[in-house]
């Protein structure tokens, strides 16, 4: 075996170990989907560090000319082996880790991925090959903390000539030793072609909400080399004009040839108790303005007087007829597996694949920004959730452990939450009027859902990820976008690309797109894809032949190959998207699940246009493919920094145009929305209206609504004596936390 880093001897050829053990509970079997424990991460890290051939160092060493472990996460076994284990009682697949190593301490630096196993006691390491025809370029690697530190130190030195310029125009400095210092936000892609690592940096004042405080200066830095001495500032842009060096800008400023903008004074508030309170910055979360709701009255909140109705066994969630396993993948985010309803598998996997935000702007950084968030650690920036704000106080909070750009597992406390909540709308209800001022009966089923939630804070933006489970076999996937807008310095020309939000602030136009993998297994793995739509027919009225009648009829389309089931933006997407089993329900219909997409996304880049190759999935609101192990992920950690030659190109999944009739199918779903920033996005984008997602809904899968099994139903029957009979199947619980006793009248009459 020949490897790029030139040390084939490190591969230990070891036979697959038998790690099967006694399985007694759902938790035991579901461990196959569980993230690595801290002990497993440490075992993998220690094993790799012990391999002298690798020459590994700490990731924190301030050099890029080193070999270091960047990421360790669970490596998912092959689906066929997992199903044999889950469904047929075969032995458990070997548990392995995926490890990414940056090999910078050699003549030709490279990035290599490995499988390390078996866990919990690893003794072999094997290189993982990229998809055929692709490679992992050194320039495509994500930026590490060490590289950011080196970049900041280099920038500090390079822009020393601008010290007075910064003090005069911003009141802040890179060289300051007080709390009035400058920072930067870098954008990507990093250059204009494969192999480059040239980043535009937006210089900002480091205050609360610094994303909204650009100074007007943007700096282009070439940091391609592993030797920091080779790094250099290539260009600067200030207030609409380009400069070749910091020295040129400083010299022209000194002689009055720069159209300088002096920013308004920022009063920094002392956070210590007793300090004089200052007016909050416009970018601050601190309340201001009139608030007409009484502050002495707390808002409503969720209570659980009798405790939770769901169960958590390890990484398995049990709720009513639902059961599923969850995982928080460090590289890409939240995933659920083995989704069962009533003991029958509905989906093998539903997972976040990628999130992108594609911008326009007048400044070089604004026009360059095309964020591909897996390249920024989308799954690892899952910071603590606040009880009562991010999740109800009654939620079960779950920790996560990530090894991402570190030297060991890092604890992210309360990174996920799990909770049941009332929806505020009944799942079903009916008032059966007698049309005489009374009723025959009233019936309703209380609306409750179970929610699994996490967030990803990718620098300025916060994504809230939800998987929602309803008692009628419906599962919903949602993404809410919030956080600070990505903003640049205001110039009049910038109004073509955004909105002026403050004196010197432009909120840049952008489109959010999120990609999901939905591996539906509807009553088995042999499924077909079809759509239903209506078509109007004009017929002679059979009971009045002299008249015509127009009515809708059903029109079904069956899709036999992948190309037919790849729907491009701009093409009409049928409303009823059905994944069907050959099995039929009692009424003769194929047992199916419907995919219902809620999105306002549009295509944002021309197909084949430069960086678009990294996000070819964004051509399709829906594409259906045959399951392949080589097509597990639609993006990668590397697509951001080498979008011109990415190692994962989704379009290639469709090239072989495979048969999709009675096959194991995967739906790839793109959702998103255009965001034109507006003044109400200050200080933050709010969640209402900035939510997209999809549902999977049973469609003739059952013989009737499975929520009939719920005991949350209430039926009211009128009685002649005036006292209505309330029929319920769960006793009305009475204590200080419960609502007033249930009552229902049902009459209506003139007054």
Curated annotation (Swiss-Prot):
InterPro entries: Cu_Am_Ox_Cu-bd (IPR049947), Cu_Am_ox_TPQ-bd (IPR049948), Cu_amine_oxidase (IPR000269), Cu_amine_oxidase_C (IPR015798), Cu_amine_oxidase_C_sf (IPR036460), Cu_amine_oxidase_N-reg (IPR016182), Cu_amine_oxidase_N2 (IPR015800), Cu_amine_oxidase_N3 (IPR015802). It comes from the Eukaryota. The modification 2',4',5'-topaquinone is found at residue 461. It is a peripheral membrane protein. Homodimer; disulfide-linked. Binds 1 copper ion per subunit. Binds 2 calcium ions per subunit. The gene is Aoc1. GO terms for cellular component: bicellular tight junction; extracellular space; plasma membrane. GO terms for molecular function: copper ion binding; diamine oxidase activity; heparin binding; histamine oxidase activity; primary methylamine oxidase activity; putrescine oxidase activity; quinone binding. This is Diamine oxidase [copper-containing]. Topaquinone (TPQ) is generated by copper-dependent autoxidation of a specific tyrosyl residue. Its cofactor is Cu(2+); Ca(2+); L-topaquinone. Cu(2+) binds at residues 510, 512, 675. Catalyzes the oxidative deamination of primary amines to the corresponding aldehydes with the concomitant production of hydrogen peroxide and ammonia. Its preferred substrates in vitro are the diamines histamine and 1-methylhistamine and it could therefore play a role in allergic and immune responses. Has a broad specificity for diamines and can also act on cadaverine and putrescine, two products of amino acid catabolism. It could also act on polyamines, like spermidine and spermine though less efficiently, and regulate various biological processes. Inhibited by amiloride and amiloride analogs.
